[in-house]
A protein has these predicted regions:
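Aromatic- and Gly/Pro-enriched helix-to-coil junctions and flexible linker segments
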Residues: 17-120
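Bacterial N-terminal signal peptides
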Residues: 6-16
Length: 120
């Protein structure tokens, strides 16, 4: 390869990496509900917003049900964590109302997931 071809290949590689989707904190792939968020919801939310109970008509077990929302409308706005009531409630420590609160890492992971488009 000549110098120009090598430089062009490196530039394409750098631009391709820089334009990728937001990755999870481990840097491997974009955040997804099933892999990165469902466990957090299970630990802190499913008791009141799961199979047996759906407080405020809100089910947090799937991306579809989170987007459908409950009495207050959609729980998230994909790409906009600051406009998402789910993020607001956990960030401001309003939810869960009893028991252990999510840690800063879990809250940030939920924020990143919503910001990256709330993928399944």
């Amino acid at each position: 390869m000549n110098c120009f071809t090598t430089l062009a290949a490196l530039l394409a590689l750098v631009l391709g990496v820089g334009c990728g989707k937001q990755a999870s904190s481990d840097g491997e792939s974009p955040l997804g509900f099933a892999r990165d968020i469902k466990g957090i919801m299970s630990r802190y939310c499913f008791e009141c917003h799961g199979v047996e109970h759906k407080e405020a008509e809100l089910d947090l077990r799937t991306v579809e049900s989170i987007l459908a929302g409950g009495e207050s409308g959609a729980a998230i706005v994909p790409g906009k964590p600051d406009e998402s009531i789910l993020f607001e409630m956990i960030h401001d420590e309003q939810m869960p109302p009893e028991g252990k609160m999510p840690g800063a890492d879990d809250i940030e992971r939920v924020r990143q997931w919503i910001a990256s488009g709330a993928k399944p």
